[in-house]
Amino acid sequence: MPRSLDNFQNEDSSHPNEQGAWADSGSGFPNPNSNDVSNSQRNHHRHMFPLARIRSELSEQDSSISFTHDPLHIPLPNPSNNNDNIFHPQVHSSFHSRSASRQRRRSGLSRSNATRYSRRSLSDWLETIRENNYDEASIPSFFSPHTERLVGRVLRLNRYLQNSELLDRNSSTFGSNPNSVFSAQPTEPSVEPPTSSFPIQPPLPPSRSISISNPQSLSFPSSFDQSNYNFQAASTPQFNPLIEHLRRSNSPLNPSHDSAGASTFNTYFPNSTYQNILNSLDNNPAVLDLNGPPNQESSSSASSYGSRTQTPNARSCSLNIVFHKHKKVCTYYMIRHYAKRRLFITPTWWLRSGSVFRGLQFGGVQSISGLPPLTNPKERWIVDVSIHVVDYKRRALEGQLNAQARSSDPSSTISTAWTGEILDFSEKLNFATEKWSAPLEIDVCYWRKLAPFQNMDTNTFLETITNPKKLYKICQKYIFMRWKDMLILKDQTDTSESRITGFYFCCLCRENGYIQGYYYDPKHAFCSQPLNLFPEQPSLSPSYHFV
């Protein structure tokens, strides 16, 4: 039934800020501002009745107070009144600022000013740092993180330039001005050059050190009194724990000086070809680079750079640095290619339990120094190798080796049981043997004789074993192993005692199953016994099974 006209007149005559009569009617829509309505219903009806929400919540008395904290409804400042501030204090307190922003504003430096500071030139930065003395005081907190990093870089650059300037002054001849170098202190301070990226750096040879080695050779003016100044070398040898460990070790490969001052290194290997290997490593540029950056004057020609020799301590320390990086190759490569599941060692059909290999092994006839081998038929042995157990998970294998001379005498047969390890280039199984009386020099010489590295020089070999990509490509074609004789099963000759002390450096070709190896004997380090094995074709028999 339609309403009467009086109801419409009463609704039109109501105050515009008051609620209309239609919102309080007895229909199914409750009053959203009543106390009987829950908060969820009130919020729901606020969307349904926007006019009722605005008229009920805002009035003429409190409309200005409600909009005070809203930045969008701030009244514009009066141009005639200079005391008015654009930012209302209540509006400023409503913003949520970070602690860094508060510190910058309290110190009078805004974000834009901090950006201008960070975009300064290098000369301005150096001037600011020297004026404020940031080396002794901490960096101000009002700098942004980007500015703090930039300040740190400039500080490091400033220290490097100061060290380089002092080094240049020490290495050059002093001029006619006596106050050019010795104006600050009567005694020249010792300044160390910037350290290398390697964790342990051996001391530099005397020919490569940057220091005042001979003060009498310097030219001074006549008015300069040299007695008041004490000279000190610019680069003094630092204490190296690795070199001290090598000096105190009892290994015959590390020189130890007795009370008379004579080295026992040359007496242990007198006039042997093993000394030629060490001399070849001395002249290797890859090993020489690890001792530190060469001097600019001495590194001008490659001939003078390669003609310098190393002491045994420096050579051992250099090889330790190279093999320390080599041990991290597998870990670095696995982290980079973890999603691809790439491994250096994958199983192959040729190397499994039950595999049999047959070939020849020559006696101690081939020299490490690369001399032509002696091809005497009486010094060849027929070798049969049987693989009993292969465990790729533990990187271990076991087998038996039967060696028989070419003569018809059956008493010349030797049988040994051996255990081996498969190299996966982790921190434990890599090219560094570190056991069985095998130093790093022997590892370099014997691994280089195998087929993957046969055409490489020492420089290329050391670069390859520390490069994960190159080493991974080689492992796709070869498997590297070490075999160690553990037990003599049948001994009827006198040569078995010498063979049990050594071990084999082996590599297996994945394409055809060919095994190439070299036997190393610590008692006869100047000779290596090559081993060549070929897989026997197994006889395959048909098998049946029911489905």
Curated annotation (Swiss-Prot):
The keyword Nucleus applies. It is found in: Nucleus. The keyword Nucleus applies. Transmembrane segments: none annotated. Keywords: Nucleus. Residues 1-42, 60-115, 169-217, 285-313 are annotated as: Disordered. Belongs to the GID4/VID24 family. Substrate-recognition component of the GID E3 ligase complex recruiting N termini and catalyzing ubiquitination of proteins targeted for degradation. GID E3 is regulated through assembly with interchangeable N-degron-binding substrate receptors induced by distinct environmental perturbations. Required for the adaptation to osmotic or heat stress. Specific for substrates with an N-terminal Pro (Pro/N-degron). Substrate-recognition component of the GID/CTLH complex. In the absence of stress, the complex exists as an inactive anticipatory complex (GID(Ant)), composed of Gid1, the E3 ubiquitin-ligase Gid2, Gid5, Gid8, and the RING-like subunit Gid9, awaiting a substrate receptor to form the active E3 ligase complex. When cells are shifted to glucose-containing medium, the substrate receptor Gid4 is induced and becomes part of the complex, named GID(SR4). Additionally, Gid7 transforms the GID(SR4) E3 ligase core into a higher-order supramolecular assembly (Chelator-GID(SR4)). This is GID complex substrate-recognition subunit 10.
